[in-house]
């Protein structure tokens, strides 16, 4: 069996790995570490939980330690870009843990945290800078960081980093980097169009694919439940009554959708937290900590926000909404069955999501088993719904009244208004709304029901 020492990792890093409890490299580490140590560009494909971070962090730390030099004021030698705050923080922690005996400096910058404190951390220069693209460009615009000294560029979760939402920021950042650099892309999935885009940032890269992106993680029991969209929340409640679901990661398609799911779960008595881009950094950190410590049994997340969630004992992944990109399904269910554990992935499939399910099964080359349940999954048919009230206070159908001609209706309403006024009551606006007119016969009320604002007519000037 290959060891970290066989891969050429230095003694101080071996000591740190031993302290962290690492005994043998994973397949992605075995293949990627020698390539990175040799200074080659790399595209590394591996599912989450396979040790991607160590696959680039270990050789980078070795290279920086072997050629020690000061980066320079406000500069960095290695730049690692990540799509989310959680992933950036996790990568920063990994660099510090693996390099604890090397004396190298690491800084992490992302939105939602103090810009001033980040400027202080960057002022003297750092060996490793981990950043989200938006916050990095904030520092660039304020001249608190410079990128002309970068020797190694890393993009983690490259499939999302190079998605259209990030590509413009990345192109700006690329113009600030020296052309003579080593570039590394690591990701769980890399569809061909994204790979072509990545090639623009890499120079003759090596490609390592330990696990094909279409292969679902081992030890994950998969199931799908066909259910109408408006029954998904009730189905989720029914599933969570099963106490074997000790820690569930639920995927929602939108931020507002995630909040709605959590609100209804809490109303039903379940401990749940949401994590997505609209949450502040403090809220996201607290939600993730509550989930890790077991204070929240359910964490509802969007696709992007889930990147960087590092929790080994997730018992169930629930796709409340099926992803419209099949590779994301593979990435999602890889959040369970980590660290040699087994796990369960359950997907809710509404009628309008069946095409997504077909794409997933086509990609993975396997049929997702249908899970049988006693829960009523279909929306009630028209003749099964509760009867509507027959009339006011349930006293039976209203009497059909013959419609009055419009003119008669107008006079009747006007007469009623005058009689009402004589009794000392203000005219009813709701009753008179269609009948109040000016001298020209135009309605006085606006469409919104509010009276228009009149201006005093000015006398004509001579």
Place the predicted regions along the sequence by residue.
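Arginine-glycine-biased low-complexity disordered regions
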Residues: 245, 267, 293, 311-313, ...
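Conserved helicase RecA-like core
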Residues: 2-381
